[in-house]
């Protein structure tokens, strides 16, 4: 896992955070917590920490530069099933994490949990977080696409909402996510919640 940083968003430097040859890393997400920073890390190796791939582990840092994993056997979510694509945020003593669940019939949907200690997790009352449907295919700027491209989008199989990321902008929550067939034909989409990020995440509980 590498990190990148810049003082001017023009000139960038890089540093390797984790170099573990026997591990397999995938999606990551970082937030500021109650005592430093937390990184959620998706893995599928080593097997003893993964269980059933994929699984999310957690690392901590005081300065964003130097990281160490929390105990993988105690601080993970969740070795008993597919849990991938983490996005983590922190509000009012709780870590909120959106992640991907594998459903029957090749469907993938994001769920949300929260935790005070990254060991014991509470499942949100309103899950899945999102569900794939035809509104994912709505095009904000159709004039930017050809007729064939619009048909390609409209005819695509959609069984997946995944890789969620989100931020707060001008008092609203902006959500970026992927939709498609989870087999390589994927598209990016945008959603919006009329409220702050904290209000949005807390509303699931």
Report residues per predicted region.
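Carbohydrate-active catalytic/glycan-binding domains of CAZyme proteins
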Residues: 1-205
């Amino acid at each position: 896992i590498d990190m990148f940083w810049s003082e001017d968003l023009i000139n960038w430097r890089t540093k390797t955070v984790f170099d573990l040859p026997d591990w397999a890393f995938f999606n990551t997400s970082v937030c500021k917590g109650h005592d430093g920073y937390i990184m959620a890390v998706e893995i599928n190796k080593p097997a003893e920490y993964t269980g059933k791939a994929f699984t999310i582990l957690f690392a901590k840092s005081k300065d964003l530069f130097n990281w160490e994993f929390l105990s993988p056997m105690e601080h993970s979510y969740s070795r008993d099933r597919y849990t991938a694509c983490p996005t983590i945020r922190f509000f009012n003593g709780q870590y909120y994490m959106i992640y991907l669940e594998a459903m029957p019939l090749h469907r993938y949907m994001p769920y949300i949990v929260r935790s005070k200690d990254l060991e014991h997790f509470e499942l949100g009352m309103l899950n899945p977080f999102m569900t794939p449907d035809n509104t994912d295919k709505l095009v904000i700027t159709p004039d930017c696409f050809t007729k064939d491209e619009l048909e390609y989008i409209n005819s695509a199989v959609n069984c997946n909402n995944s890789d969620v990321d989100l931020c707060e902008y001008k008092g609203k929550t902006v959500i970026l996510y992927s939709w498609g067939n989870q087999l390589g034909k994927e598209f990016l989409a945008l959603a919006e919640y009329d409220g702050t990020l904290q209000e949005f995440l807390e509303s699931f509980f």
